[in-house]
Amino acid sequence: MTISSQEQETKKVQVTVDKNPVATSFEKWAKPGHFSRTLAKGPKTTTWIWNLHADAHDFDSHTSSLEEVSRKIFSAHFGQLAIIFLWLSGMYFHGAKFSNYIAWLSNPTAIKPSAQIVWPIVGQEILNGDVGGGFQGVQITSGFFQIWRASGITTEFELYATAIGGLFMACLMLFAGWFHYHKAAPKLEWFQNVESMMNHHLAGLLGLGCLGWAGHQIHISIPINKLLDSGVSPQELPLPHEFLVNRELVSQLYPSFSKGIIPFFTLNWNEYSDFLTFKGGLNPITGGLWLTDTAHHHLALAVLFLVAGHMYRTNWGIGHSMKEILEAHKGPFTGEGHKGIYEILTTSWHAQLAINLAMMGSLSIIVAHHMYAMPPYPYIATDYPTQLSLFTHHMWIGGFCIVGAGAHASIFMVRDYNPAQNYNNVLDRVIRHRDAIISHLNWVCIFLGFHSFGLYIHNDTMRALGRSQDMFSDTAIQLQPIFAQWIQNIHSLAPSNTSPNALATASYAFGGDVIAVNNKIAMMPINLGTADFMVHHIHAFTIHVTVLILVKGFLFSRNSRLIPDKSSLGFRFPCDGPGRGGTCQVSGWDHVFLGLFWMYNSLSIAIFHFSWKMQSDVWGSVTPAGTVSHITGGNFAQSAITINGWLRDFLWAQASQVIQSYGSALSAYGLIFLGAHFVWAFSLMFLFSGRGYWQELIESIVWAHNKVKVAPSIQPRALSITQGRAVGVAHYLLGGIGTTWAFFLARIISVG
């Protein structure tokens, strides 16, 4: 039944804590495995160390109390924040002490960013390359210099101050993590009070966060950047606080500042249009978004989130109730709708985490695509190594988060799902027609795989036979991505109707001019053709297979026709016991394991597509006469339509820089390229191995030790099947990521 507003109001929100619930004891923590009765007894076999790592953060296995688990997670979040602040502080400190930031600031197009100087011990100083301006160091590709410029940082002193601030925040977070677990730990109802949490996160985190950044941009960044853009040297600029306290200073740059806040309260908001703009496009001096546009954007978001932060009903009997919304959410084909989902999301943190990981992972991938289409910071678009690094980084982060969503969805199904509380709701109905979902998804994967790969096989065959007129290409049988081209066209034409005062389209990827900074291309229209159409369908194929594996793992994690009692076997198990062959790799854990390989496939092709497409069709230079020349001279359209083209003109041709890097400042990438290949190959030893083989080997080695009376007291054991797979997939991905990283950076630092 729905609770009325009056009844809701009687349930007052209170912040309740338990005082001193858990003693602070270094003696206890010093004991390995203190969280588990079995592990605390110490090692009998080498399996103990594996179980120690597997269970240390599996709070469900430490206690069955949801309140205690919630407190541990809450406390761990503060620890995570402390690490992030410490890392950030280190980045800012390096910028202050070891970088050429000030030199870069005065000439960002000719000088490359560096914030790491390798000390000479046994000749590593070869890695300190000449980055311009007489500075020797390792070129960095993190984008920190560009974000510092956008923040209005112009001196090393400001970087030091921020680094100290980061250290202070890290200490504060560590203290908070200890305090809220050992001294004043919130009660379970505080963690389950979703309306209050939504209000505070929306209004506080997002609303005030956006407002703070908008305020900083308006008062500090925009005036400083305007002066830098007009050629004022960083040394001549006033200190940032001058812009805050001296209104005259800013009024010279933005006249509306002289009017103060009167236009705001008299609703003449148009007065502020000199620093809150709606220009669209990119600043031609920096190749980044107009900072006055981004300030406007964050101010608008702040208003939006501050309003949204008053949306949910807490102590005042007004606003939405999450439970009511979910239970009212019924459709003609959805039975009980979302009845029971509220209870799931307030009692299963795995279910909550699965949704959050899927959302944040997708958001990270969206960020990757916006970072190059609408470069947010000054001079980031012309720093090709940074652009490539940030795209790759956000794609990887997104992929891991999405696979993590599949993992925690399966853990929820095994550990937290209660069939009795979920009768005929959407979740139950999805699980009941899972066969239809999985078989259809499987059909889609087979269709996409055969057709997309078939187009490539056809092209390779025709090219081998010398029948180029029979190939799918822009010059023979065209497969133009007409829908994508239509969307591009709409987006390039739309601003003239929807925002007539805008100077340009939102992104030059859709159409418009070539934006070049110092004759180096920042962004330009990205033409799509047959090659993009073909690669796109490979993307569709690999993504659908990844989804198939993860969704099948989640939907069949409790039971299947093959193993009806899967839920009693747990989240990870090797098979259904002796005497049941053919039941390997069916656990929820194994689906995550398999999903990781396909996630790797998907993302490799996506980042390869991006890297080659940008070098071929976007990145390059413009001559004074206006002739555009690209790094690889537009070879994508004709080469990316065959498998041989990908192998020869992308992988092999662009690997020359990393392979020939020895003896140069890029030699570290050559070594990483080699070493990461070895790490990847090492993974195969675990992925193709049989456990019995190793156990036999171990036993003969133990016999030899006994013979010479040096037998170990801890009995050696071969890795379990699951442990072997975990080591295998970890090295497979680490090796693959390391190889790609070295390949990309050696290439783009050389030619970019």
From Swiss-Prot:
- Keyword Metal-binding listed? The answer is yes
The entry marks the following residues as binding phylloquinone, namely W694
Return the cofactor note field.
P700 is a chlorophyll a/chlorophyll a' dimer, A0 is one or more chlorophyll a, A1 is one or both phylloquinones and FX is a shared 4Fe-4S iron-sulfur center.
Sequence intervals crossing the membrane:
73-96, 159-182, 198-222, 294-312, 349-372, 388-414, 436-458, 533-551, 591-612, 666-688, 726-746
Family matches, as SUPFAM superfamilies: Photosystem I subunits PsaA/PsaB
Which molecular function term from Gene Ontology is one that the record holds? oxidoreductase activity
Regarding protein family, the annotation reads: Belongs to the PsaA/PsaB family.
Family matches, as PANTHER family: OUTER MEMBRANE PROTEIN, OMPA-RELATED (PTHR30128), PHOTOSYSTEM I P700 CHLOROPHYLL A APOPROTEIN A1-RELATED (PTHR30128:SF19)
Q: What is this protein called?
A: Photosystem I P700 chlorophyll a apoprotein A1
